[in-house]
Amino acid sequence: MLVKEFDYHLPEELIARYPAPERDGSRLMLLNRESGTIGHGLFRDIADHLRPGDLLVLNDTRVIPARLFGRKATGGRVEIFLVRRQETQAERWSCLMRSSKGMRPGQLITLAGAMTALVVERLEPEGWLLEFQGAEPFSVWLEREGEMPLPPYLQRPAESGDQLRYQTVFARSAGAVAAPTAGLHFTPELLERLAERGVATACLTLHTGPGTFQPLRVERVQDHRIHSERYHISAETCQAIAETKQRGGRVVAVGTTSARTLEYAADEKGGLCPGSGDADIFIYPGYRFRVVDALVTNFHLPESTLIMLVSAFAGKEYVFHAYHEAARLGYRFYSYGDAMFIE
């Protein structure tokens, strides 16, 4: 299976540079795997397509303002992208860096607000280990000085509105450097209406990493090595999923991050055990889903691992037909774009 088989043409004007005025005002494409039909609606009406007894599984990760800017001792500008905090007493992070000239261990980067970053070592296969030191807790400093890490395809700097809109309303656990975008469409009022309809919710955590934006650098899909991301599933969520299955309800994954976490943590029979760890599951056509019965997701980049997961869930031909139809009808694509519900 070749990566180029997952390519498609998208006019630039269909890339959503900004979110819709209202979270739940996005369009919603409706796919039914059994009938092969394609329908259309608004996201705020998703309750009409869910059933009492269904369980929405949400990713409650919180996006950190992971983009930082500093200066080397020479005055050269450095851009830092936080990836993952290391499990050490010191405030050490694996990072990606961009600089006019190469970096080396031992260099000190000066940041705003009396914060410095020491370059500790080069990491393989890419990135750097930095140690941050300042007069106040790093987390407090970061919330004030960091910039929201918008996807590169938005081709614009982060603005004040992104602090709110590039974050789900149920975000709790800080650690992601990319939003679980399917969750951006939900409002507290919509979640309340779903609960009144008998649709339950449960949360897990997957801290989305920068690999979600990185292109596949291989020709064959099966040769790709996917990035790992930290996850956590509670005993309460595992129990809710088991009880939903026993009652005949559907487990509806909100986003590819929730779907990957559920499938990674499941055993051969679809059973789940609570726990934490690093998820590195790569789902592409041919994979048999063990837990997920329905999926809420956005429209994804060509040749991405995300469109491969959606193709595995609904069938590649069906998904690409839906994508072409969405482009023809002027749907908005990518992180701030419209959504689809696949059942």
From Swiss-Prot:
It catalyses: 7-aminomethyl-7-carbaguanosine(34) in tRNA + S-adenosyl-L-methionine = epoxyqueuosine(34) in tRNA + adenine + L-methionine + 2 H(+). It holds the Pfam family Queuosine_synth. Gene3D superfamilies: QueA-like. Its EC number is 2.4.99.17. It comes from the Bacteria. The keyword S-adenosyl-L-methionine applies. It is found in: Cytoplasm. InterPro entries: QueA (IPR003699), QueA_dom1 (IPR042118), QueA_dom2 (IPR042119), QueA_sf (IPR036100). Pathway: tRNA modification; tRNA-queuosine biosynthesis. One of its GO terms (molecular function) is S-adenosylmethionine:tRNA ribosyltransferase-isomerase activity. Its main location: cytoplasm. One of its GO terms (biological process) is tRNA wobble guanine modification. It is an enzyme of class 2 (transferase). SUPFAM superfamilies: QueA-like. Transfers and isomerizes the ribose moiety from AdoMet to the 7-aminomethyl group of 7-deazaguanine (preQ1-tRNA) to give epoxyqueuosine (oQ-tRNA). HAMAP family: QueA. Monomer. Belongs to the QueA family. This is S-adenosylmethionine:tRNA ribosyltransferase-isomerase. The lineage of its organism: Bacteria, Pseudomonadati, Thermodesulfobacteriota, Desulfuromonadia, Desulfuromonadales.
